[in-house]
């Protein structure tokens, strides 16, 4: 009698969480597609909920992505970098979006090449490459939302992206809501069921398990870098309105 082994069903391994470089690459393409759809509209209008125009918000976004790469390269212990790269103020919006792609690619390449043990200063928590990737993804998601909402282009940050950002940068975020709605609430952009819209906010970029650092360098507020920063725009250094 030939015995056949009983079939066994293997338990599938849990799916690996997406890598931050993959999330940043996807966020870049998603944001650029939405912004390109709005390229022919009036970018002199104020971005949703911000004091900046849509054009100035785009400049802030490119500056922030470049700055995150610079922080990981220079690795300062107590200050922001001294290089600030912004978009040509005379350039057309489609050309500015090319500049945004350059800034995002620069950030992505730097993050990919940075060893995991590296730390760099940020006013909202000294962080690692994954933390700066999460910040870059957040900047893309939030400011694409700000611009597209102001210009009437339907768009919302992807739920998977928002869930990853919340887990990395907002460990105390409320549960029981959609990730996108929760991220917008955490960053002062919308109310959440049972919770009023936040007036002030910040994320926590510190690496879990690292020893806390005390003190805030001179010239830095609790909500970002000096000299000016809107409380709802994120921590990249603000671009003064032209």
Model-derived features with residue positions:
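An amphipathic alpha-helix adjacent to DNA-recognition modules
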Residues: 62-69
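Short, charge-patterned binding micro-sites
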Residues: 83-87
């Amino acid at each position: 009698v030939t015995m056949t082994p009983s079939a066994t069903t293997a338990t599938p391994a849990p799916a690996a969480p997406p890598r931050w470089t993959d999330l940043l690459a996807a966020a870049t393409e998603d944001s650029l597609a939405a912004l390109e759809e709005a390229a022919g509209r009036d970018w002199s209008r104020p971005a949703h909920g911000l004091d900046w125009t849509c054009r100035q918000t785009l400049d802030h976004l490119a500056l922030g992505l470049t700055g995150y790469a610079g922080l990981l390269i220079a690795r300062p212990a107590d200050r922001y970098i001294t290089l600030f790269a912004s978009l040509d103020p005379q350039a057309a919006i489609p050309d500015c979006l090319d500049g945004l792609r350059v800034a995002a690619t620069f950030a992505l390449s730097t993050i990919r090449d940075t060893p995991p043990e590296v730390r760099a200063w940020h006013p909202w928590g000294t962080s690692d490459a994954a933390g700066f990737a999460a910040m870059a993804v957040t900047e893309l998601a939030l400011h694409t939302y700000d611009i597209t909402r102001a210009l009437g282009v339907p768009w919302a940050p992807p739920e998977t992206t928002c869930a990853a950002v919340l887990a990395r940068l907002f460990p105390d975020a409320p549960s029981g809501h959609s990730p996108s709605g929760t991220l917008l609430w955490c960053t002062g952009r919308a109310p959440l069921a049972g919770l009023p819209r936040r007036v002030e906010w910040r994320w926590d970029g510190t690496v879990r398990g690292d020893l806390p650092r005390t003190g805030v360098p001179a010239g830095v507020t609790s909500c970002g870098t000096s000299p000016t920063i809107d409380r709802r725009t994120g921590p990249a250094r603000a671009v003064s309105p032209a």
